[in-house]
From Swiss-Prot:
GO terms for biological process: arginine biosynthetic process via ornithine; citrulline biosynthetic process; L-arginine biosynthetic process. Carbamoyl phosphate binds at S57, T58, R59, T60, Q84, R108, H135, P136, C137, Q138, C264, L265, R292. It comes from the Bacteria. This is Ornithine carbamoyltransferase. The keyword Transferase applies. Its EC number is 2.1.3.3. Disulfide bonds: none annotated. InterPro entries: Asp/Orn_carbamoyltranf_P-bd, Asp/Orn_carbamoylTrfase, Asp/Orn_carbamoylTrfase_sf, Asp_carbamoyltransf_Asp/Orn-bd, Orn/put_carbamltrans, OTCase_ArgI. NCBIfam families: orni_carb_tr (TIGR00658), PRK00779.1 (NF001986). Its main location: cytoplasm. It comes from Paracidovorax citrulli (strain AAC00-1) (Acidovorax citrulli).
Length: 309
């Protein structure tokens, strides 16, 4: 397939402008409304999405696959086990071949450089479904969920409690672009690196050694698993290091009374979050999970059709 001359990829959160995000959030609300009213919405009829998974996933696969079908399109699912990607065939060659047969590619992999190499040789838009460095689709869903429940995120405070991982990196990019503040608290040795996120040191974020202080006055507290996929060998060491970085009722009480709790899932109750928090009244994790599908539908529509009325 051949995309328009103004083709865009979505590899990091900072790939889009604040104006584009404003459109995507509005469009996601419209698309979600149609879904809730059982209205058919098939702008991508006869379009095909290729999903390439080097890292396995539940939510990423279901949200993209169901979303593309709901938009009227079709899906091809590939893993490194049943394709030549990154094995006998160079990534660049795979990109040149696959992008001649489909309209859109989503990749969930380990190294950010791998998806960037693929995109550099693709004739169609490429979406980052997750890498070790960034998770833009998840933060897109998180911010949309916040807007649904509390309005604009501009000027608000988000507390990130846990690992300085791909989620934390993406939150830093989002804060700089959309004008809010992130309080980051990680154990020693697991800090977020602003150079990876590509944001100015201290720009729109503050670092706290005490997770409770990071949560003080926050509008949103969010976290992730202590041991991400690919780091299983470090699991026991991480459990010891992260023991004080479990989001609990005391942290939620330190935040604003109307503060929300989010988690990208899967969650380990009793580790990064207590059960009474994730299953409590301030938690919006199930809306957050569903919204992956709606924002990604808006994203796919935008990448292929541009802004629509």
């Amino acid at each position: 397939m051949k995309a328009p001359s103004d083709m865009k990829h979505y590899l990091q959160f900072k790939d889009f402008s604040a104006q584009e995000y404003a459109y995507l959030f509005e469009r996601a609300a419209v698309i979600k409304g149609k879904f809730k009213r059982y209205e058919k919405h098939h702008p991508l009829t006869d379009r095909t999405l290729a999903m390439i998974f080097e890292k396995a996933s539940t939510r990423t696969r279901v949200s993209f696959e169901a979303g593309m079908y709901q938009l009227g399109g079709s899906v091809v699912h590939l893993t490194t086990g049943d394709s030549q990607l990154g094995r006998a065939e160079p990534i660049e060659d795979s990109a040149k071949v696959i992008s001649r047969m489909v309209d859109l590619v989503m990749i969930r992999t380990y190294e950010q450089t791998k998806i960037e190499r693929f995109a550099a040789h693709s004739r169609v838009p490429v979406i980052n479904g997750l890498t070790n460095e960034f998770h833009p689709c998840q933060i897109l869903a998180d911010i949309f969920t916040f807007i649904e429940h509390r309005g604009s995120i501009q000027g608000r405070t988000v507390a990130w409690v846990g690992d300085g991982n791909n989620m934390a990196n993406t939150w830093l990019q989002a804060a700089e672009l959309l004008g809010f503040t992130v309080h980051v608290s990680t154990p020693s040795g697991y800090e977020v690196d602003s150079r990876v996120a590509g944001v100015a040191a201290g720009s729109h974020y503050k670092v706290f050694s005490d997770p409770l202080e990071a949560c003080r006055g926050a509008d949103l507290i969010t976290t992730d698993v202590w041991t991400s996929m690919g780091y299983e060998a470090e699991n026991e060491a991480r459990k010891k290091a992260f023991a004080d970085w479990c989001v609990d009722a005391e942290m939620m009480a330190a935040a604003r009374p109307e503060a929300l709790f989010m988690h990208c899932l899967p969650a380990h109750r009793g580790e990064e979050v207590e059960a009474d928090v994730i299953d409590g009244p301030q938690s919006v994790v199930w809306d957050e999970a569903e919204n992956r599908m709606h924002v990604q539908k808006a994203l796919m529509e935008y990448l292929l059709l541009g802004q629509v009325a």
